[in-house]
Design a protein with these regions (language model features):
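Glycine-biased, small-residue-rich flexible motifs in mid-sequence functional cores and linkers
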Residues: 1-188
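NAD-dependent ADP-ribosyltransferases
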Residues: 165-369
Length: 369
């Protein structure tokens, strides 16, 4: 497959094809298959099957990468615009093809100069480049007074915009999270998990760690009103895989770790809050609890909170250090970390157990009744 991947140049196999760009604004971090812009984009791309057209697509945002995936599924030719780099561009093409599951016989890659530009500036340059290159532009869901609408307004006099399939723009709804009653957690769950370390999950913005984008898009299109990578589905994936996947987000030296908290569930509940800066919850009421001795034997260690920016001692792994933050709120999480993925295989219910707070409360109340 990698041998067949090619760059778009003067000898393009799509010479004579009519180029099409489908224009969508950003809609939010947690889309579902029921979102109108996704359904309309899918229908338009599948309507192009068998036509002598080539779709202009790109990467770097969900609305562009979804089109790459849909074009591959519909058997529609595409030219994927990627940031140009002095080195490793061929590797980037291979990775993109693998992640999005594109058909190498129907795909070419076109580099777009991106040197010395930040991500936002490149995104504007990419969108303008695609719209100017296209023979036909199909707006689907464009945010009023947004950057994309401004670009379309400039291009409109050229007469290549087909607005016949455009729908009203509506941002994706927020992520619904139902938290259990704090008193019930304190009275029912805290005694069960006293002293245990808990890894709390949250919704994933896009693919799970270790998951290909094409698998995420497959599930997104099949989903209805529920986001396919919600905290609950992440929790279910951990149980089915018997593995907690590590993340390097905000960890020294980008060391992938699995984080745990020593807080009783009722206290952890107070920290489950929406974080506007990251457009997500800190964590949600679905966790994996590990018995203390098992945690220690498995290599889970307590995080050391630093008062100063000075480098930590070399004899202690860097991933165990964490700055206190400007408000000094990191220590209240009582965090522990495990280097790399945490394997649940072979651990008994006495050593590790799921901590779905709502389910634990419901089961206990039913047993009492």
């Amino acid at each position: 497959m990698h041998q067949a991947i090619s760059m778009h140049d003067g000898s393009s196999r799509f010479r004579g094809f009519r180029s099409i760009a489908i224009a969508n604004s950003t809609h939010g971090k947690y889309p579902t298959g029921a979102d109108s812009w996704i359904q309309h984009t899918r229908d338009i791309i599948f309507s192009l099957t068998g036509e002598k057209v080539v779709l202009l697509t790109s990467t770097g945002s969900l609305n562009w990468e979804l089109q790459c995936y849909l074009a591959a599924r519909a058997g529609v030719a595409q030219i994927i615009i990627l940031p140009a780099t002095r080195t490793h561009f061929h590797h980037r093409m291979i990775e993109c093809a693998d992640q999005l599951g594109v058909d190498p016989d129907l795909t070419e890659f076109l580099p777009l100069e991106a040197a010395r530009e930040n991500l936002r500036n490149y995104g504007e340059k990419r969108d303008r480049f695609i719209l100017e290159m296209a023979d036909r532009i199909i707006p689907v869901s464009v945010r009023p007074n947004g950057r994309l609408e401004s670009l379309l307004r400039v291009i409109q006099p050229h007469g290549k915009i087909d607005a016949s399939m455009q729908i009203h723009w509506a941002g994706s709804p927020g992520l619904p999270v139902k938290l259990p009653d704090a008193e019930a957690v304190r009275n029912i769950v805290d005694p069960i998990l006293e002293g245990w370390l808990i890894h709390w999950t949250r919704a994933s913005q896009g693919p799970w760690p270790g998951e290909k984008k094409c698998d995420f898009f497959r599930d997104l299109l099949e989903s209805r009103s529920e986001y396919p990578r919600s905290a609950q589905k992440t929790f279910q994936r951990i149980l089915s895989e018997k593995k907690i996947r590590a993340s390097s987000w905000r960890i020294r030296n980008n060391q992938p770790v699995v984080a745990f908290s020593a807080l009783p569930p009722s206290q952890a509940l107070r920290l489950m809050r929406w974080r506007p800066r990251y457009v997500r919850f800190s964590f949600e009421p679905f966790g994996i609890a590990v018995e203390p001795e098992t945690a220690s034997a498995s290599g889970i260690r307590e995080v050391i909170y630093l008062e100063s920016p000075d480098p930590p001692p070399e004899e202690i792994p860097a991933y165990l250090f964490q700055g206190r933050g400007k408000k000094g709120d990191w220590p209240i999480e009582q965090e522990y970390r495990h280097p790399g993925d945490f394997d649940l295989t072979g651990l008994s219910r006495n050593e590790v157990q799921p901590a779905d707070l709502m389910e634990m409360i419901t089961k206990t109340n039913k047993a009492v009744d």
